[in-house]
Amino acid sequence: MLSIKKANFEDIEKEWAFVRDMPEDENGLTNAWHGISHDDFETKALPDMLRFERGENLPDWMVPETFLFLWEDDTIIGQFRIRHYLNDALREGAGHIGQFIAKEYRGKGYGTKGLALTLEVARTIIPEEEIYLRVNRDNPASLKVMQKNGGRIVKEDEEHYFVRIKK
């Protein structure tokens, strides 16, 4: 059964393996913890994820952010991130939500279902009337995921589509 769960210590082994193996930067979603050791994940990365959600000791440029993992039964197949509100850089940039589906699960509808589950959570957190997303122009699959969840392109530049979804 498909479900979405916040980062937590109870699932540390599977979260660590998933985050460790996520690319450092793919389609605009960065992963500062690519290749991380188990010890560093347990003592630094996972505590940081939980601290980011609480908005504690964030750098000035950062906003609170919730890390969610998409599960199919007992396997993590994706990660979604919800930025709780927008600053100027996010409003003109990455927006509220970042998403990643592991390569072996792409093209099977998991992105669409995962974003739908993430939007349910986001709607309880985000104060803005619309949810902002951005997608690389060379990533039509992610654009389609957003559109299947009610997304509409409101702007584009040479590299990106800027998408909005009604709250």
Model-derived features with residue positions:
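GNAT-family acyltransferases
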Residues: 1-96, 156-167
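Conserved GNAT acetyl-CoA-binding A-motif
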Residues: 124-134
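Conserved acetyl-CoA pyrophosphate-binding loop and the N-cap/start of the following alpha-helix
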Residues: 105, 109-117
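Residue-level recognition of the GNAT/N-acetyltransferase active site
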Residues: 98, 102-106, 136
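Short glycine-rich hinge loops at helix-strand junctions in the catalytic core
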Residues: 109, 126-127, 150
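Short coil/turn motifs at secondary-structure junctions
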Residues: 85-87, 104, 138
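Conserved active-site alpha-helix within GNAT-family acetyltransferase domains
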Residues: 112, 137-155
